[in-house]
């Protein structure tokens, strides 16, 4: 196993460990590069498709935490390939704002992360849009 693979595995496992116990904000603070970005499938209400910078990602995550009741969450075992890893994530929640306000929903996605110098530099998220 290459040093790059080992470093990515370490970051991947730490992300899963934190997210599995609801410490998503801690994961962002600890594991993300300052210049990290997220790429979503599409824009959402009040949310751009591409979000740049750790500070902006933290602001988005903090708003989500304040406006969403989490009933349960899960994060699958990470699968690593070089400087990237994927994992399956699920969330059972009720939003207090937006088009899905007060409706309980289950969200499931596959996340593809890229790691450079021991930090997550990009997260791409894949999910079905009900098509």
Regions found by a protein language model. Name each.
Residues 61, 75, 95, 105-106, ...:
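Ligand-binding pocket scaffold of soluble enzyme catalytic domains
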Residues 106-131:
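Short beta-strand edge/turn micro-motifs at domain boundaries
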Residues 1-10, 131:
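Basic/polar N-terminal segments that are highly enriched at the extreme N-terminus
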Residues 81-93:
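A short hydrophobic beta-strand element
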Residues 66-69, 93-105:
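Short, cysteine-centered beta-strand-loop-beta hairpins and adjacent loop/turn segments enriched
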Residues 5-6, 25, 29-82:
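A solvent-exposed, acidic/Ser-Thr-rich amphipathic alpha-helical stretch
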Residues 32, 91-93, 126-127:
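Short beta-strand segments enriched in hydrophobic/aromatic residues
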């Amino acid at each position: 196993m290459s040093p790059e693979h080992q470093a990515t595995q370490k970051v991947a496992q730490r992300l899963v460990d934190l997210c599995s116990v609801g410490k998503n904000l801690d994961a962002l603070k600890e594991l993300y590069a300052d210049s990290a970005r997220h790429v979503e499938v599409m824009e959402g209400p009040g949310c751009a498709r591409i979000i740049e910078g750790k500070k902006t990602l933290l602001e988005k995550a903090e708003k989500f935490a304040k406006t969403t009741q989490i009933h349960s969450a899960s994060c699958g075992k990470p699968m690593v390939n070089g400087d990237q890893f994927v994992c399956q994530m699920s969330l059972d929640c009720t939003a207090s704002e937006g088009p899905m306000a007060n409706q309980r929903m289950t969200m499931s996605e596959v996340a593809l992360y890229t790691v450079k110098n021991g930090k997550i530099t990009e997260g791409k998220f894949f999910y079905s849009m009900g098509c």
